[in-house]
Amino acid sequence: MTELCPVYAPFFGAIGCASAIIFTSLGAAYGTAKSGVGICATCVLRPDLLFKNIVPVIMAGIIAIYGLVVSVLVCYSLGQKQALYTGFIQLGAGLSVGLSGLAAGFAIGIVGDAGVRGSSQQPRLFVGMILILIFAEVLGLYGLIVALLLNSRATQDVVC
């Protein structure tokens, strides 16, 4: 082991791999739960709106897929002999998609809950809810793009 390739370098990559899936799953779970509560509350009086109002739950689930993609990519590039640079890049990629997915899940949950409740009373609010949900979903997509760019730079010319 050299100073560029210490024995603990893969630990940072493993933490990046775990944080990608953990934080995006937390965001997706919050978004699903918060939107689901709004759907259940509105479908008591308007059961015909169930399938129309399921959009926030689907969009919250997509956030977890972003974390899964990055987690699998980081996991496949983990190695026993790895540069510290690579471990830090993998950690950054995992945190990038994970924390942006957490924020996107929170936004989707809050907007989905309020939007579903509002659109059951005023159907014209549905289009506005969808537009706001798209902007919230893009927050997670930004983190995915940054994570993929970081992961593509993880294998530099450092030889262990």
Curated annotation (Swiss-Prot):
GO molecular function, a single term: proton-transporting ATPase activity, rotational mechanism
Membrane topology (Vacuolar): 1-8, 75-90, 151-160
Gene3D superfamilies named in the record: lithium bound rotor ring of v- atpase
Keyword RNA-binding on entry: no
Annotated site (Essential for proton translocation): 137
Spans through the membrane: 9-31, 54-74, 91-112, 125-150
Key words of the record: Hydrogen ion transport, Ion transport, Membrane, Transmembrane, Transmembrane helix, Transport, Vacuole
Function of the protein: Proton-conducting pore forming subunit of the V0 complex of vacuolar(H+)-ATPase (V-ATPase), a multisubunit enzyme composed of a peripheral complex (V1) that hydrolyzes ATP and a membrane integral complex (V0) that translocates protons. V-ATPase is responsible for acidifying and maintaining the pH of intracellular compartments.
Binding partners and assembly: V-ATPase is a heteromultimeric enzyme composed of a peripheral catalytic V1 complex (components A to H) attached to an integral membrane V0 proton pore complex (components: a, c, c', c'', d, e, f and VOA1). The decameric c-ring forms the proton-conducting pore, and is composed of eight proteolipid subunits c, one subunit c' and one subunit c''.
Protein name from the UniProt record: V-type proton ATPase subunit c
